């Protein structure tokens, strides 16, 4: 509901859409790595305990929409778009707002669509049909070098664009 979105946003970032000074919203570190159920409870609403992900409808990407920020939790911003072109644009905006050069994921059947997505989104790792969190760190789902340190290349002002490892 709208009320739950406001509660969630204020718990996670201290601000919600329309709040004064919303552009200065900051992620609450205590929620990192917590379950969806725990986060909802802290925010002040109930969801089933076995809920894996909280999906939150958003209208825009940027500082006025705190839920569009990086969340490091099982909370996803969801954008309704009319076609793949608009979807690619939203994905590009998310990467540019939250981590230029880092990673982006797409799930589709067509190689041409994945290629078009990769050309639009400024990310060093385009993860295709793999879980994005674990796909980005490599090894299990793809041939990326296993690492928890991921370079962002020149997009992110890094000297390294790949996964950094001692291997």
Where are the regions that the model predicts?
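ALDH superfamily catalytic-core signature
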Residues: 1-62, 83-89
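Conserved C-terminal structural/oligomerization subdomain of aldehyde/semialdehyde dehydrogenase
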Residues: 45-167
């Amino acid at each position: 509901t709208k009320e739950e979105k406001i509660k969630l946003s204020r718990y996670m970032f201290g601000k919600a859409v329309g709040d004064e000074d919303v552009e200065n919203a900051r992620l609450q570190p205590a929620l990192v790595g917590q379950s969806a159920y725990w986060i909802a409870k802290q925010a002040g609403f109930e969801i089933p305990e076995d809920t894996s992900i909280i999906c939150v409808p958003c209208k825009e990407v940027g500082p006025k929409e705190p839920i569009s920020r990086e969340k490091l939790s099982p909370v996803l911003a969801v954008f309704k778009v009319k076609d793949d072109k608009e979807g690619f644009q939203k994905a590009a905006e998310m990467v540019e707002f939250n981590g230029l050069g880092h990673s982006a994921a797409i799930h589709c059947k067509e190689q041409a669509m994945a290629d078009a997505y990769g050309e639009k989104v400024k990310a060093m790792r385009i993860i295709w049909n793999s879980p994005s969190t674990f796909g980005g760190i490599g090894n299990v789902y793809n041939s990326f070098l296993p690492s928890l340190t991921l370079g962002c290349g020149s997009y992110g002002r890094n000297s390294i664009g790949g996964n950094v490892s001692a291997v």
